[in-house]
Amino acid sequence: PTDEQYRLSRMIAAYAQIKSECAAMKNRHHAAKDEEAAKAYAEIIKAMNEQLEVLKEKIKEQTEKPNCKEGVKRLETIPAIGRMTAAVLFHHLTSSKFETSNKFAAFAGLSPQQKESGTSVRGKGKLTKFGNRKLRAVLF
């Protein structure tokens, strides 16, 4: 990956980490029994949300750089894929080289798997739970 792609991946990782911490902080805020603690949690949540917005803007700026722009724009042509989802997909597509689309689908945990025993096949195939959890979470 180029320096621009590496910066994009670091920003995406930071965004995901802060978003996860913000969700945990919201749970603490909800469970707080003390008014002062709840107030402190609310201030922290507000600061985290502001930082998430700043990071989102920086990610958008990074996707406008020459090494990222074309790939992200192509991914955005897919229905229901926005800038953030396209940026995450672009990061995963460029950080690993996939020989076929089937290999990428397996990496993302989007390939169907059938349950079979010997010659019998039980039911229809379902999506596997294998693959990259973070990538699958962005897509669903």
Language-model regions: role of each:
Residues 42, 72, 76, 83-90:
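Short, well-structured alpha-helical segments
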Residues 1-74:
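Long, charge-rich intrinsically disordered scaffolds of nucleic-acid metabolism proteins
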Residues 71-79, 126-130:
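Cytochrome P450 C-terminal beta-domain/meander region
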Residues 7, 52-55, 79-82, 115, ...:
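A short alpha-helix capping/helix-coil boundary motif
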Residues 32, 36, 66, 81-84, ...:
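Residue-level signal for short amphipathic helical patches enriched in basic/charged
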Residues 83, 87-140:
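Phosphate-backbone recognition surface of nucleic-acid-processing proteins
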